Swiss-Prot record:
<keyword id="KW-0808">Transferase</keyword>
<feature type="binding site">
    <location>
        <position position="104"/>
    </location>
    <ligand>
        <name>nicotinamide</name>
    </ligand>
</feature>
<feature type="binding site">
    <location>
        <position position="105"/>
    </location>
    <ligand>
        <name>nicotinamide</name>
    </ligand>
</feature>
<dbReference type="Pfam" id="PF02146">
    <property type="entry name" value="SIR2"/>
</dbReference>
<feature type="binding site">
    <location>
        <position position="213"/>
    </location>
    <ligand>
        <name>NAD(+)</name>
    </ligand>
</feature>
<feature type="active site" description="Proton acceptor">
    <location>
        <position position="120"/>
    </location>
</feature>
<feature type="binding site">
    <location>
        <position position="34"/>
    </location>
    <ligand>
        <name>nicotinamide</name>
    </ligand>
</feature>
<dbReference type="InterPro" id="IPR050134">
    <property type="entry name" value="NAD-dep_sirtuin_deacylases"/>
</dbReference>
<dbReference type="GO" id="GO:0017136">
    <property type="term" value="F:histone deacetylase activity, NAD-dependent"/>
</dbReference>
<feature type="binding site">
    <location>
        <position position="104"/>
    </location>
    <ligand>
        <name>NAD(+)</name>
    </ligand>
</feature>
<dbReference type="InterPro" id="IPR029035">
    <property type="entry name" value="DHS-like_NAD/FAD-binding_dom"/>
</dbReference>
<feature type="binding site">
    <location>
        <position position="151"/>
    </location>
    <ligand>
        <name>Zn(2+)</name>
    </ligand>
</feature>
<comment type="function">
    <text>NAD-dependent protein deacetylase which modulates the activities of several enzymes which are inactive in their acetylated form.</text>
</comment>
<feature type="binding site">
    <location>
        <position position="105"/>
    </location>
    <ligand>
        <name>NAD(+)</name>
    </ligand>
</feature>
<dbReference type="InterPro" id="IPR028628">
    <property type="entry name" value="Sirtuin_class_U"/>
</dbReference>
<feature type="binding site">
    <location>
        <position position="35"/>
    </location>
    <ligand>
        <name>NAD(+)</name>
    </ligand>
</feature>
<protein>
    <recommendedName>
        <fullName>NAD-dependent protein deacetylase</fullName>
        <ecNumber>2.3.1.286</ecNumber>
    </recommendedName>
</protein>
Length: 242
């Protein structure tokens, strides 16, 4: 309980809080961890189907697999969970908080967070590769192969595909170097370059670092506080302190 008290005090005093979230932030909403043994990435061909090269070569087939892999026709059923709401509430209290998320579900924004950097893009939108007009998830659901209404070009999803660079990487690094506190929630820290963020925050920036993850990551030495809990349990622990 002492750790919860200390972390609550740290969050109350912090000027700039940065939160890195992974799949564990969304599994409590019922969204499968795509990288788990039984997840949607378990198919050996998934990396090919979700690659920039495949989209460029076979955009119609790409959209078929994209919709199947991410099950976008049922995506509206997923709702923000207590972890999403907790982060949004911190922002509503006036905290300068930015979320760096590896998730592509858009639930941080749906939950009310305003300052979110989608490191791997988002399933919620797509755009025309020619005129850049944006389209929402419902438009993608309604059209087997979604095309721009103006240009008739097949839409480009706003998820970062294999073979793409991370367009938001520099923005994320800039935020890391400004932060007082880094909270890492629901990620195994196995995927680079995101896996290096805790070390940057602790060793180079001198920020207080907090890990919330059910399983150990092998990077516990980069954290001042380690909570081997579900995110909902962590939030409950903080909330129980009077």
């Amino acid at each position: 309980m002492q750790q919860f008290e200390e972390v609550r005090t740290i969050l109350e005093k912090a000027k700039k809080i940065t939160v890195l979230t992974g799949a564990g932030a969304s599994t409590e909403s019922g969204i499968p961890d795509f990288r788990s043994a039984n997840g949607l990435y378990a198919d050996a061909n998934v990396e090919m189907y979700l690659s920039r090269g495949y989209y460029n070569r076979s955009p119609k087939e790409f959209w078929k697999h994209y919709k199947e892999i991410f099950q976008i026709n049922t995506f509206h059923q997923y709702k923000p969970n207590r972890g999403h709401r907790f982060l949004a509430e911190l922002e509503e209290q006036g905290k300068d908080i930015t979320i760096l998320t590896q998730n592509i579900d858009g639930l941080h924004q749906v939950g009310g967070s305003k300052h979110v950097i989608d490191l791997h893009g988002t399933l919620q939108t797509a755009h025309c590769p020619k005129c850049k007009m944006g389209y929402d998830l419902q438009y993608m659901i309604d059209h087997e192969v979604p095309r721009c209404e103006k240009c008739n070009f097949i839409l480009n999803p706003d998820v970062v595909l294999y073979g793409d660079t991370l367009p938001q990487y520099q923005n994320a690094i800039k935020r890391l170097y400004e932060t007082d506190v880094l909270i890492v929630m629901g990620t195994s820290l196995k995927v680079q370059p995101v896996a290096s963020f805790p070390q940057i925050a602790k060793r180079e920036v001198g920020a207080t670092t907090i890990l919330v993850n059910e399983e150990l990551t092998g990077q516990e030495y980069n954290f001042d506080y380690v909570f081997q809990n579900k995110i909902g349990e962590f939030v409950e622990g903080l909330s129980s302190i009077k």
